[in-house]
Curated annotation (Swiss-Prot):
Its EC number is 2.3.1.225. It is a multi-pass membrane protein. This is Palmitoyltransferase ZDHHC16. Keywords: Acyltransferase, Apoptosis, DNA damage, Endoplasmic reticulum, Membrane, Transferase, Transmembrane, Transmembrane helix.
Amino acid sequence: MRGQRSLLLGPARLCLRLLLLLGYRRRCPPLLRGLVQRWRYGKVCLRSLLYNSFGGSDTAVDAAFEPVYWLVDNVIRWFGVVFVVLVIVLTGSIVAIAYLCVLPLILRTYSVPRLCWHFFYSHWNLILIVFHYYQAITTPPGYPPQGRNDIATVSICKKCIYPKPARTHHCSICNRCVLKMDHHCPWLNNCVGHYNHRYFFSFCFFMTLGCVYCSYGSWDLFREAYAAIEKMKQLDKNKLQAVANQTYHQTPPPTFSFRERMTHKSLVYLWFLCSSVALALGALTVWHAVLISRGETSIERHINKKERRRLQAKGRVFRNPYNYGCLDNWKVFLGVDTGRHWLTRVLLPSSHLPHGNGMSWEPPPWVTAHSASVMAV
């Protein structure tokens, strides 16, 4: 803040000094002398209200954009409910189309083993999507306890003015600190943190699988429906011409029923929606998978990137203290302790708690010795 004020007041201060050097007090008219006095008085008043020796350009920018930050935070907070309803409505529409439009078609064409496979896989995928989305919305991400002095803290939150454990960050939308905060997700209307990070990623992963399954499985139906829609457009065009030219005894051209029209349009809608979501959400899922493999969150990636550059300039190597190795990172993230847990905790709905309490980050006992040595560096 002080740097910006000096930049703005520099030319005015230079003019005042020139006037002093030229002896303005004897030669300048009283009007100019009064303006100079008012300028000095205004500068003293401004400094008495705004001057802060601890401030800087970053403080000035934050203060200037504070109304914008407040508007964005409050808009996202209210739009989160709209986004959650939108996800539920769109997902429900795909399920309804699958039962009302796709199922009657495949019952007439698919064999019994193929029908059984699609039946079990689609319902397994749907159950996992619904379970993880519900858990991601309703599970609190985890907050540091207030009033306790026995927790290991790294710094003090500038917003909450409370001790902040490692990997904890302040969410301006929720207006509180979150343990192992990854980001605030408007599609969940919730922060993604220590206790619901697994639910968020699992929802993204299984939703991507479901969209890819629907897009690939309905490709033939989509092509037939798209061709039928084009044929409907041509028939409607020919019908208008025939009505204009037909005689009283001529039969009007055949047309599609309302149910056939809605079925074809629904199949096209299903394919386009699932394909677009598969691409967008698939890219997001891959990105978070890379971060999990590195033992980072979205926020920590930017922090570690700056720290890596700072240490590289000093000729030193940065090591992420929370990186146990790719496989062990996934075990910690998914809460997998034994081989059986890959089935019961990953491929089936499970509400088990993650490792640790989100405030201290000691390596689990089954982490390899190499990972433990990395933690000690």
